[in-house]
Amino acid sequence: MADRGSFGFAPRLDIKQLLSEAQHRWLRPAEICEILRNHQKFHIASEPPNRPPSGSLFLFDRKVLRYFRKDGHNWRKKKDGKTVKEAHEKLKVGSIDVLHCYYAHGEDNENFQRRCYWMLEQDLMHIVFVHYLEVKGNRMSTSGTKENHSNSLSGTGSVNVDSTATRSSILSPLCEDADSGDSRQASSSLQQNPEPQTVVPQIMHHQNASTINSYNTTSVLGNRDGWTSAHGNRVKGSNSQRSGDVPAWDASFENSLARYQNLPYNAPLTQTQPSTFGLIPMEGKTEKGSLLTSEHLRNPLQSQVNWQTPVQESVPLQKWPMDSHSGMTDATDLALFGQGAHENFGTFSSLLGSQDQQSSSFQAPFTNNEAAYIPKLGPEDLIYEASANQTLPLRKALLKKEDSLKKVDSFSRWVSKELGEMEDLQMQSSSGGIAWTSVECENAAAGSSLSPSLSEDQRFTMIDFWPKWTQTDSEVEVMVIGTFLLSPQEVTSYSWSCMFGEVEVPADILVDGVLCCHAPPHEVGRVPFYITCSDRFSCSEVREFDFLPGSTRKLNATDIYGANTIETSLHLRFENLLALRCSVQEHHIFENVGEKRRKISKIMLLKDEKEPPLPGTIEKDLTELEAKERLIREEFEDKLYLWLIHKVTEEGKGPNILDEDGQGVLHLAAALGYDWAIKPILAAGVSINFRDANGWSALHWAAFSGREDTVAVLVSLGADAGALADPSPEHPLGKTAADLAYGNGHRGISGFLAESSLTSYLEKLTVDAKENSSADSSGAKAVLTVAERTATPMSYGDVPETLSMKDSLTAVLNATQAADRLHQVFRMQSFQRKQLSELGGDNKFDISDELAVSFAAAKTKKSGHSSGAVHAAAVQIQKKYRGWKKRKEFLLIRQRIVKIQAHVRGHQVRKQYRAIIWSVGLLEKIILRWRRKGSGLRGFKRDTISKPTEPVCPAPQEDDYDFLKEGRKQTEERLQKALTRVKSMAQYPEARAQYRRLLTVVEGFRENEASSSSALKNNTEEAANYNEEDDLIDIDSLLDDDTFMSLAFE
C-alpha cells in the first residue's frame, strides 16, 4: 500500500469525529501529536478536574499547573501506598519517538484508566494531553472457541439467540483500530450492555500485508472456524477489529437479508453525540465540523510518517443511511439487519461459497485500484463482534485503500515489501502471545516458505543491537543487548540463534542479556532481525537490519605507513592484539552481571555517538591518503569496540592484557594516534595511567611519537603528565613524557606537558588537610591548569606568530608561578616537620604524623598571635640602644660577659683533667699490662700492628623523613627541569605553533565535553522532574495488567 508520507498527502483529521471516537478508544500517537502541536486552537485547563468521567480529554500547561494529576480519582498506588503507580513508555510515529506516555489504572475500578501524553520536543513538552477512558471487560481467551462453535452448530440447523445478545456491526475490509499502544485492551475488550440487543455476524476479510498490526500482542483476529462467545448468550468480539464501513452487498446477499427487515426488534437506541469533557476548540480557531488540514495545522514528521489517514472523498453507501454529523449508521437499520442474521447463518455461509461469481458486484463501489486491496471472503472469516456503544460507527472514509491507521513496525514493513503480492497471509494470536504462521503463496516451493515466525511465548527482550547495517559481503559481528525472561538454568539449556531475514545463524552468550552473532552475506535490502531458539520462531521483538550495497575494501597498513616503518609494526601488533579472544564459560555468564552490563552499555553508547558514515559518503575534499586512513579507522573502530565488549565479559585481566612486546591496546592506540579509541578503552575499565612492561603510560607513547591530538585528549581526560617511566641504567631517575617528547624534537609537546605537570602537581598538593591556607587559595587563582587555559583569540590584524608568542609567554608565566609556589609549599612542609620534632620526636603519645604536622602548624600559628607583647618589648629595647653611645656600651658589656663565660667553662674542664689522667693510667696498668700481659701504651706503634677486622655494626635506624627529604630533592630537580622545558619551548617558533595547536585541541575537547554533559544533565533533570510523581514501567504490574501498552511503536 502506498505510503502517504512519501507522497506528501496532508492528513485530514475531523476533530469532531476524533473527539467522538475518544469516548470508546484511545487516540493514536499521530492524532495526539496533531492536537499537541495545535494546542493554541483548544482550551487549556487552568485547574485540575474533579473526578472526570470516561472519555474526558484535557490539555494542561505543566509550567502553569504542576499538579494536574490531582483529579479526585483513586488510582492504583505503589507499595508505599502514597505515590501513584504509573507506567511509562515512549510512543513512536513511524520509526521516531515523539511522545511520552504515562498511564495509571483505577484502584476501585481497574478498567478505568488515565493516560498523560506530552511531546519529546523541547518547545512543546510543557503541554500535556490527558485522556480518561473506561475499558469494558477483561482479556479474551480464544481457547475453546472451536469447541463452542462445534457445539453450537451440531445440535440444530440454526443458531438461536435470545433478546439479550449484543448488537454488533459488520467490519470493513481493513482493520481500523490499530491505535496507540492499547491494542491489547482494545482487541480483547468484552463489551457488555444491559439493554436487550441482537447479534449480527461480523465479516472479517483477509488483510493486506501492510495493514497487519504486528505489535497487537493479544489481538483476536478471529477464530476463523466459528463463533466467539462468552458469558452465556452475550457474544463478544475483538474491539480492535472494529471498522468504519462496509461495502454495498451484491444482489443475492441483499435478497437473503430482505426477510429480516420485517422481524420484530427492540426499541432503537438514540444516537447521541458523546461529550468530550475538557477538550473544547477555541472560538475563532476552527469552524464547527471543519477538518484540520495542512492549511492551518502542521504535519508532524512529514518525511518519516508511515501511517494512513482517510482521504477527503467518501464512497456512497446505497443501503446504509449515515448520520451527517456523527458519521454513525442508523440504529434502526442496524437492528433490522442484525435481528435475524444469526438464525440464518447457513444461508449466509452458502452465499459466501459463491463469492467468485459475485465478486464483480461486491467490488462495484470501488475503483480499479481500490478493488485490488479487497481480499476474498471465506466462511472462516466470520466472527462475532459486540459494540460498547451498541452501534458501531461506519465511517465512509475507511472504504479507501489508505483508510486504516496501520502500525508500521519493522516486521510489517518487511512483510509489505516482501509479501505485497501475496493474498493469503494468515495471522492469528492466542492468549500466550503472537503466532505468525507460514506464508502460503503461489511462488513458495512445496507449499511452504522460510518467512519469519513469531513464537507463542517471548523469552528475550531486545533493548538494542549494534551494528544496524553492514555491506552485503561483510560478515560483521552483531552485538545484541537485552534481557532474558527465563531463569539462568533455562537460559543455558537453550541454543540461541539470530535470524537475518530467512537465514538463521548461531549466537553466543557473552553475559546475561548480551548475545553476539555474525551477520551472514546477504543481498541488498532490509530484513527482519530477531532472536530465536534455533527453531526459526522469534522469541523476541522484531527489528530491522540493513544490507547496503558495496563490498568491503581491505587495506593493509603498508598502503598508508609504508613497508618498513615503526607505524606499520605498531599497526600489525594492534591488529594481532585485537584478534586475541577467549570463550566465555557458562558459569561466568551470570557473574558480575551489573558491572559488565554497565561497561557494555557505555561502550555501545560511545559507538552510537561516533557512528561512522555510510559507505560512499566520504568527503570529496579528502586526499587519497586521508581517505585510506578513514577507511582503516572505520574497520579498526568496529573491531576495537567488539574486542572491548568481549574482553569486558571475560574473566582475568580483561582489556588490560599486554601483547608479546609488553604493550596494551591503550599504548598501541596512543602510539598510532588513534585518539578516537581512548574513550571506549577507558569505558571498558582500563586506567588512563595504565603502564606497559617498561613503565610507559599511554601519554609516554603519544609524546614519544609526537601525536598532538592524542596528547591533548589524554591530558584532558586526566592523564598524569608527571608520571615517571621505570628507571634504567641510562636514566636512573626515570623519564617523564615531556622528556621523551623533548628527546624526539617535539618541543611544543614537551613544553605543554611540562606546564601541565607543574600546574597539576600544585593543584594536588595541600599543606594542611583541615584548613585551606591562603597560599593554596591564591595559587589556585594565580596558576591556571591546562583545563582552564584557553588559546589567545584571534582578532583583526593578528598573525599566527604573534598569537603563538602570546600563548607561549603566558605558559612561561604560568609555569614559573606554579614552580615558585611549589617551592614555598616544600619549605612550609619542612618547617612543619621541624616543629613536629620539637613537639616530641619519640612520639610518646602515639599520634600520627599528619596529626602532628597539623598540631605543629597550629602551634606555630598560635605562637605568632601570642608573642605580640614580647615583640613590642624587643622593639623598645632596640629603640633604646639605637644610639651609638648606648650601642657601644652594650657591645662592651656583651664582650665581657662572653669572656667570663669562656673562663668558667675552661676552668670546669680543667678540673676534670686529673681525674681523667688517673683513670686512664689505672686502666693501662691493670688491664693492658697485668691482665693481658702486654706492653701497655708504652712503645705503641700503629703501623707494625695489623689492623683488626672491624665488627659489622648494625645499620643505624633510618628515619622516614630522610627518605622523604631525598625524594623531595629529586622532585625539585624535576620541577626545575620542567620549568626549563617550558622556557625552551618559548624560544622556537615551531614549538610555539605546536603548543598553540595543543591548546586549541584541548579547548575544543573541553567544549564538546561540556555540551555533552549539559545535555546529559538536562535529560537527567527532566527525568527527575518526571519521576517526582511518575514511576518507570513496573514489570509485575504489566504482567498482571490486561491493558498494558505494546513496547513496539516503530
Curated annotation (Swiss-Prot):
<feature type="coiled-coil region">
    <location>
        <begin position="957"/>
        <end position="985"/>
    </location>
</feature>
<dbReference type="GO" id="GO:0045893">
    <property type="term" value="P:positive regulation of DNA-templated transcription"/>
</dbReference>
<feature type="domain" description="IQ 1">
    <location>
        <begin position="870"/>
        <end position="899"/>
    </location>
</feature>
<keyword id="KW-0175">Coiled coil</keyword>
<keyword id="KW-0539">Nucleus</keyword>
<keyword id="KW-0106">Calcium</keyword>
<dbReference type="Pfam" id="PF00612">
    <property type="entry name" value="IQ"/>
</dbReference>
<feature type="region of interest" description="Calmodulin-binding">
    <location>
        <begin position="918"/>
        <end position="940"/>
    </location>
</feature>
<dbReference type="InterPro" id="IPR014756">
    <property type="entry name" value="Ig_E-set"/>
</dbReference>
<feature type="DNA-binding region" description="CG-1">
    <location>
        <begin position="15"/>
        <end position="141"/>
    </location>
</feature>
<feature type="repeat" description="ANK 1">
    <location>
        <begin position="661"/>
        <end position="690"/>
    </location>
</feature>
<keyword id="KW-0597">Phosphoprotein</keyword>
<dbReference type="InterPro" id="IPR005559">
    <property type="entry name" value="CG-1_dom"/>
</dbReference>
<keyword id="KW-0346">Stress response</keyword>
<keyword id="KW-0238">DNA-binding</keyword>
<dbReference type="GO" id="GO:0006355">
    <property type="term" value="P:regulation of DNA-templated transcription"/>
</dbReference>
<dbReference type="GO" id="GO:0005516">
    <property type="term" value="F:calmodulin binding"/>
</dbReference>
<feature type="repeat" description="ANK 2">
    <location>
        <begin position="694"/>
        <end position="723"/>
    </location>
</feature>
<dbReference type="GO" id="GO:0009409">
    <property type="term" value="P:response to cold"/>
</dbReference>
<dbReference type="Pfam" id="PF12796">
    <property type="entry name" value="Ank_2"/>
</dbReference>
<keyword id="KW-0040">ANK repeat</keyword>
<dbReference type="InterPro" id="IPR002110">
    <property type="entry name" value="Ankyrin_rpt"/>
</dbReference>
<keyword id="KW-0677">Repeat</keyword>
<dbReference type="InterPro" id="IPR027417">
    <property type="entry name" value="P-loop_NTPase"/>
</dbReference>
<feature type="modified residue" description="Phosphoserine">
    <location>
        <position position="984"/>
    </location>
</feature>
<feature type="region of interest" description="Disordered">
    <location>
        <begin position="223"/>
        <end position="246"/>
    </location>
</feature>
<dbReference type="InterPro" id="IPR013783">
    <property type="entry name" value="Ig-like_fold"/>
</dbReference>
<keyword id="KW-0010">Activator</keyword>
<comment type="similarity">
    <text>Belongs to the CAMTA family.</text>
</comment>
<dbReference type="GO" id="GO:0071275">
    <property type="term" value="P:cellular response to aluminum ion"/>
</dbReference>
<comment type="function">
    <text>Transcription activator that binds to the DNA consensus sequence 5'-[ACG]CGCG[GTC]-3'. Regulates transcriptional activity in response to calcium signals. Binds calmodulin in a calcium-dependent manner. Involved in freezing tolerance in association with CAMTA1 and CAMTA3. Contributes together with CAMTA1 and CAMTA3 to the positive regulation of the cold-induced expression of DREB1A/CBF3, DREB1B/CBF1 and DREB1C/CBF2. Involved together with CAMTA3 and CAMTA4 in the positive regulation of a general stress response. Involved in tolerance to aluminum.</text>
</comment>
<keyword id="KW-0112">Calmodulin-binding</keyword>
<feature type="domain" description="IQ 2">
    <location>
        <begin position="893"/>
        <end position="922"/>
    </location>
</feature>
<dbReference type="GO" id="GO:0000976">
    <property type="term" value="F:transcription cis-regulatory region binding"/>
</dbReference>
<feature type="region of interest" description="Disordered">
    <location>
        <begin position="141"/>
        <end position="196"/>
    </location>
</feature>
<keyword id="KW-0804">Transcription</keyword>
<dbReference type="InterPro" id="IPR000048">
    <property type="entry name" value="IQ_motif_EF-hand-BS"/>
</dbReference>
<dbReference type="Pfam" id="PF03859">
    <property type="entry name" value="CG-1"/>
</dbReference>
<dbReference type="InterPro" id="IPR036770">
    <property type="entry name" value="Ankyrin_rpt-contain_sf"/>
</dbReference>
<keyword id="KW-0805">Transcription regulation</keyword>
<feature type="compositionally biased region" description="Polar residues">
    <location>
        <begin position="141"/>
        <end position="171"/>
    </location>
</feature>
<dbReference type="GO" id="GO:0003700">
    <property type="term" value="F:DNA-binding transcription factor activity"/>
</dbReference>
